[in-house]
Every structure is written in structure tokens, then in C-alpha cells.
From Swiss-Prot:
Described purpose of this protein according to its UniProt entry: Catalyzes the NADPH-dependent reduction of L-glutamate 5-phosphate into L-glutamate 5-semialdehyde and phosphate. The product spontaneously undergoes cyclization to form 1-pyrroline-5-carboxylate.
Location relative to the cell: Cytoplasm
Pathway: Amino-acid biosynthesis; L-proline biosynthesis; L-glutamate 5-semialdehyde from L-glutamate: step 2/2
Catalysed reactions, as listed in the record: L-glutamate 5-semialdehyde + phosphate + NADP(+) = L-glutamyl 5-phosphate + NADPH + H(+)
Keyword Zinc found: no
Name used for this protein in its record: Gamma-glutamyl phosphate reductase
Root EC class: oxidoreductase
Any one GO molecular function term: glutamate-5-semialdehyde dehydrogenase activity
Organism of this sequence: Desulfosudis oleivorans (strain DSM 6200 / JCM 39069 / Hxd3)
InterPro entries listed in its UniProt record: Ald_DH/histidinol_DH, Ald_DH_C, Ald_DH_N, Aldehyde_DH_dom, G-glutamylP_reductase_CS, Glu-5-SA_DH, GPR_dom
Pfam families membership: Aldedh (PF00171)
Family matches, as PANTHER family: DELTA-1-PYRROLINE-5-CARBOXYLATE SYNTHASE (PTHR11063:SF8), GLUTAMATE SEMIALDEHYDE DEHYDROGENASE (PTHR11063)
Record's keyword terms, sorted: Amino-acid biosynthesis, Cytoplasm, NADP, Oxidoreductase, Proline biosynthesis
């Protein structure tokens, strides 16, 4: 069978299974999630044996230590995947919830009701844990899912797929509700992106190159964020101690994630009070600064920021720093160089905070809090499948509700239109 035929068969099976999943009772979905959590522990040795094949191949091809770390399915990773499934099982089921109801003058009762999106395709790199995490979220929201992981994790993902299928069968759900693309060839991705007849949404998770490839080649709607160029703006009347704590956390806690700060903007009237102490704190943590001319006048030992630095998602202990003349200049900088991901203002002015919230066009905008809070769990959404900087169909962290849509339901008693 050709790769194209394999993908078409997978997509058709997912579409068929979506009909059953759309009306699957909550308790049955939860049962499947809990069964999968238990089976992950039972199948741990088999999963790790397959993972070892991927790790050996990765080392032989010179994959970086960071990539190998993401690829490794340790006991802790298995426990984390199982715990995540149990957490999803405990979350409220969005399917069937009515968000608004009203009665028309002719007696028709109209409501909006949440329903699954249908078939979701997820294309991702390296991390085998995404296979289980994504499957759990999609199932709880009543969707079916086609998972295409990176070729470097093929053995691991096949093993996880077998565990998922066994759990679905045990719980009486369609085994094709979760399918892993079984071939490593990149041609499979191209064919997957052409299945608009069967797949309702594509979610890519990975580097900017992968995401741009998916967007350019997909005939199916895509939810994505290319990168996280996140900003913190320190206003003229900010509490300096608070600002330093927020900036340090936003850059240093986990510099390799998409909600880490990449550019620091400081009001000119606060720069002298803020930057020297902040720079010393960053230096102690190994953060390399790249600054504009005004920044370098205060911090002469740092590198000069080039134009490319303002666009950069470093994912490392590197930070671009710019002194701005006003909050409006900070907002303009974010509009020019930002990626619609996460932005922060540190200020004691309520009016400026509210204006910043209204003017900045990003998926999460915070006042006096770290960029690191752009996360489904931290915002009270529960688990998330990713962060979207697309405004259609979701903007920001995508939890269970964002994996559903709404339809209108109308109850009548014989009304006809005159």
C-alpha cells in the first residue's frame, strides 16, 4: 500500500470513529482515560524498550543532548503522562454544555451547545509524551485524533499507540479514535495535510520551520503559533523590586520555552533606577544582554542589539533590551516585532495598565505578572494542547473548551415561517 493510501485509510477511519465519539458519555470517556493511565504503567517496559531503539538511533545520528532528553521516556515521564490523563479525566466535560439560551417571540427556544470539532490532526516533533497528552485531551473533548510524531520517535510512538488502542478497546471505544501515522517518511505529512474531506483541524507543535511548512501546505484550517517573542515593559512608575522579580522569572526560570521573555522594554525615566541592578542579577544567572544605544550607555559592557535581535526567539539565556521614550513607543515596538504570544506591563498606574491591555494585540496580556503564566494550567483552564496566536478558532492556551465548537439547537412546537 502506498503512503497516500495509508493516510487516506487512517483519515476515513478517524472520520467514522468521530460519529461515535461525538455522543460518547462522559463517564465512558473518563473510563478510557483512567484505563490508559493504568496501562501505561503496565506496559512501561515494552514502551521503554522501543524508546531505547529511538535513543540509540538518535545518538548514532548526532542528535543534540537537549533533543535526546526530550525523546527519552523515563519512569518519570511515564508517571507524568499517567498523572496528566487522570487530571484530564477529572476536568469538566465541555461537550453538551449550553453557553446561551433565549426564547423568540414565536415561541422557538434557541441555544448554543458545545460539540466536538471532529477529527484533529496533530503534527509534532521529538516528544513521545505529546502522543499521550494530545490523545487524552482530544478524547475528553469527544474528538478523534491522528498523531504524526517526528521520525526520531517512531518506535516510541508505535508502542504508545498500541497501549492507547488496547485501552480504547478495553473501554468499549473505537480503537481508531486515536491513530498514530505508522510511517517515518515526510511524504506522509503532505498527504495528511490534504485530507480536508476527513480532517477538521490541524495543530502543529514544534519549531518555526515545521509550523511554517504545515501552514504553507495544508488545505485544512491550522491552529498554530510560529514563535514566542514575549515582551516585558517596565513603566516609568513601576515598583523596581517587583519589576526585577518578574523579569528574572520570565527570562531565567525556563529560558527554552515559548512563554519566556525575549525582549525587555524599559521606560527612559525608569532605566537608570532599574537596569544596572537588573543587569547584575542577570549576569549572575548567566544571561547575555544585547542592548540599544541608550541601554549600552547605562550598561557599556553588553553587546549591541541588531535589528534581528528584536525579532528573535532565543530560547536561551540571551535577552534583548531597549529603552523607550513612552508606553506608546513600547506598544509600537511590540506591534512591529512581536509574535502575538505574551506581553507584560509592570506599572503602578491603573489607567496605563488598562490602556496597555486594550492596545496590545497578543493572546495573553498581563499586568504585574510574569510571562510564564501563559499556560493552560496556570490560567485555570486545566491541561492544554498548545498555545494559539491565530485568532480563528482559538487565541491563547487551548484547553478542552478550545477543542470544541458550538452549534445552534432550536426547540419548537410546530412553528412555520410566514
Amino acid at each position: 500500500m502506498t503512503i497516500e493510501a495509508t493516510i487516506v485509510d487512517i483519515a476515513k477511519a478517524a472520520k467514522k470513529a468521530a460519529l461515535a465519539m461525538a455522543t460518547c458519555p462522559t463517564d465512558k470517556k473518563n473510563q478510557a482515560l483512567l484505563a490508559l493511565a493504568d496501562r501505561l504503567h503496565k506496559d512501561a517496559a515494552l514502551i521503554q524498550a522501543e524508546n531505547k531503539k529511538d535513543l540509540e538511533a538518535a545518538k548514532a545520528t548526532g542528535l543534540s543532548s537537549a533533543m535526546i532528553d526530550r525523546l527519552t521516556v523515563s519512569d518519570a515521564v511515564i508517571a507524568s503522562m499517567a498523572d496528566g490523563l487522570r487530571e484530564v479525566a477529572a476536568l469538566p466535560d465541555p461537550v453538551g454544555a449550553k453557553s446561551a439560551t433565549w426564547r423568540r417571540p414565536n415561541g422557538l427556544e434557541v441555544a448554543r451547545m458545545r460539540i466536538p470539532l471532529g477529527v484533529i490532526g496533530i503534527i509534532y516533533e521529538s516528544r513521545p509524551n505529546v502522543t499521550v497528552d494530545a490523545a487524552g485531551l482530544c478524547l475528553k473533548a469527544g474528538n478523534t485524533v491522528i498523531l504524526r510524531g517526528g521520525s526520531e520517535a517512531l518506535h516510541s510512538n508505535r508502542a504508545l499507540a498500541a497501549t492507547i488502542s488496547a485501552s480504547l478497546a478495553e473501554s468499549g471505544l473505537p480503537e481508531t479514535a486515536v491513530q498514530v501515522v505508522p510511517v517515518a517518511d515526510r511524504e506522509a505529512v503532505t498527504h495528511l495535510l490534504a485530507q480536508e474531506e476527513y480532517i477538521d483541524l490541524i495543530i502543529p507543535r514544534g519549531g518555526e520551520g515545521l509550523i511554517r511548512f504545515v501552514v504553507q501546505h495544508s488545505s485544512i484550517p491550522v491552529l498554530k503559533h510560529y514563535k514566542g517573542v514575549c515582551h516585558v515593559y517596565v513603566d516609568q512608575d513601576a515598583d523596581m523590586e517587583m519589576a526585577r522579580a518578574i523579569c528574572f522569572n520570565a527570562k531565567v526560570q525556563r529560558p527554552g520555552v515559548c512563554n519566556a521573555m525575549e525582549t525587555l522594554l524599559v521606560h527612559r525615566d525608569a532605566a537608570q533606577r532599574f537596569l544596572p541592578d537588573m543587569a547584575r542579577q542577570f549576569a549572575d544567572a548567566g544571561v547575555a544582554l544585547r542592548g540599544c544605544a541608550a541601554t549600552r550607555a547605562l550598561l557599556p559592557g553588553i553587546e549591541t542589539a541588531e535589528e534581528a535581535d528584536w525579532y528573535a526567539e532565543y530560547l536561551d539565556l540571551i535577552l534583548a533590551v531597549k529603552v523607550v521614550d513612552s508606553m506608546d513607543a513600547a506598544i509600537s515596538h511590540i506591534a512591529t516585532y512581536g509574535s502575538s504570544h505574551t506581553e507584560v506591563i509592570v506599572t503602578n498606574s491603573y489607567d496605563r495598565a488598562m490602556r496597555f491591555l486594550a492596545a496590545v494585540d497578543s493572546s495573553v496580556v498581563l499586568v504585574n505578572a510574569s510571562t510564564r503564566f501563559n499556560d493552560g494550567g496556570q490560567l485555570g483552564l486545566g491541561a492544554e494542547i498548545g498555545i494559539s496566536t491565530s485568532k480563528l478558532h482559538a487565541f491563547g492556551p487551548m484547553g478542552l473548551e478550545e477543542l470544541t465548537t458550538t452549534k445552534f439547537i432550536v426547540l419548537g412546537n410546530g412553528q412555520i415561517r410566514e
